[in-house]
């Protein structure tokens, strides 16, 4: 039987349908309020508003749960590879062996970008941020696929594969251009993560051998960042896509949103904070500064809009960080890791942070891993974009397959 919530406005009662969720909180359907009650709902930042129905990702922030298509994120990070998770997000189920092989072959086949795109990079000054370069390059793919202004359902999967395949190539090209090195072409004998590391660190005169521990760590990082419900960048992609815009242009809007320091740039801020603290002996001083409302200092890497418990992604990354530093001989002498571990231990015992449910989030350890890998801080958000492109394309595809889809138009 249908359930309803009652809304009383100026003495008149309106019955609002309660939509049952397959898991998690139920939802009150307010779509008819403006037409029937002659008023709108007001919810800055969409704190309590669902903008769509989705079966891709589920989060229970109070319990620290993150699932993709029903699979726990920790299981996926430990037992899957990134393209297997990409297939899961896009198609709704894990691939068979044959499906996985076909999918990875298609991704490899589309990893090259048009040679004319190389000229675009030459228009940027040498000091340009890699995110600025990547944003422009991804948006320019719209010019190479102009027919996608009139895309059909048959185009959804190929478009997703093309975007997933080309984003690491463009990301590596953005980095190479920013440091004045020649572009390295994809090597389809390597898997997705190996190929990206190869394009990042190889040169025409120096062969780069991928360390398997580094590869596995980056694979986990990509999986952990693949999707996260209707966050700022995902919502941006959906809003742009709702107008029927070219999908490559839609992804470029997601990259722009992700670039913001409150979204994708937080792990770089964590590194800067740990450097500012400088030594474990100064942690109490900075804890006090974080509690002081009049002090501009903020404890980065703690707290999350959704999670009111330990971010499950942070738990995986903490152990991954230790594995990487042990492999590189830095486990016992990496000052940033030592500060991070002690800062976390002190904060988790402090009533101020406990009462406010401020726990380490996914950004707290990822920057330390990137830095140990030799990835510069200006590339941190670029790597986030590589991973999140999978989620963006899955959400974009789901949106266009939704019969209730309308152009987004907030009031």
Swiss-Prot record:
Annotated GO biological process: tricarboxylic acid cycle
GO molecular function, one term: citrate (Si)-synthase activity
UniProt organism field: Rickettsia parkeri
Superkingdom: Bacteria
Matching NCBIfam families: cit_synth_I, PRK05614.1
Protein's UniProt name: Citrate synthase
Pathway where this protein functions: Carbohydrate metabolism; tricarboxylic acid cycle; isocitrate from oxaloacetate: step 1/2
Lineage of source species: Bacteria, Pseudomonadati, Pseudomonadota, Alphaproteobacteria, Rickettsiales
Pfam families to which the protein is assigned, alphabetical: Citrate_synt (PF00285)
Enzymatic reactions: oxaloacetate + acetyl-CoA + H2O = citrate + CoA + H(+)
